[in-house]
A protein has these predicted regions:
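Conserved helicase NTPase motor core
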Residues: 1-96, 108-115
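ASCE P-loop NTPase helicase motor core
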Residues: 98-100
């Protein structure tokens, strides 16, 4: 890691995390610059909000908390779909958003257009075990569908062989 940081410095380069931190520090410490960008964008949209990290959350706050833009902020996210914890994402930003923006209207998207109800019932039973989540019940008009079969592989090689065999059966 030290060599990586040294290579960045030597090449006068930054990585994605550095870009975020530099932007946050600039906007946090420079009121005029912050006001410029708050005025530049009347609306802010953040998609996949459950996969934002602390720096991205603060960047959003710095840009949205402007008297002139009336906090015109639209975020889309679902704590149950967070998959980037290993990259610093924190699904709890969804709860922080509700705390920091108490006037925000929350719309639950529970209607599913892709899956059958059998699949959604399995998903509902799994996500019900997630902690610190917004309660919701996924549903569809696509019908019940066929039963879900579960296969537990011993390792990734066994899993790959199983998937290949299932594909061959198609």
């Amino acid at each position: 890691y030290a060599r990586y940081q040294e290579a960045l410095h030597t090449n006068n380069a930054v990585d994605f995390d550095d870009l975020l931190m530099h932007a946050v520090l600039l906007l946090r410490n420079n009121v005029e610059l912050r006001a410029k960008y708050q005025q530049k964008w009347q609306y802010l949209l953040v998609d996949e909000f459950q996969d934002t990290n602390a720096a991205q959350y603060e960047l959003m706050q710095l840009l949205a908390n402007a008297p002139l833009n009336n906090r015109n902020l639209f975020v889309v996210g679902d704590e149950d779909q967070s998959i980037y914890r290993f990259r610093g994402a924190d699904y709890r930003n969804v709860q922080l958003f509700r705390r920091d923006f108490p006037d925000a209207v929350v719309v639950l998207l529970e209607q599913n257009y892709r899956s059958t109800q059998t699949i959604l019932d399995v998903a509902n039973s799994l996500i019900a075990n997630n902690r610190n989540r917004t309660p919701k019940r996924l549903r569809t008009d696509n019908g019940q569908g066929i039963p879900v079969h579960v296969y537990e592989a011993y390792n990734e090689v066994e899993e790959a062989a199983f998937v290949a065999d299932e594909i061959q059966k198609l």
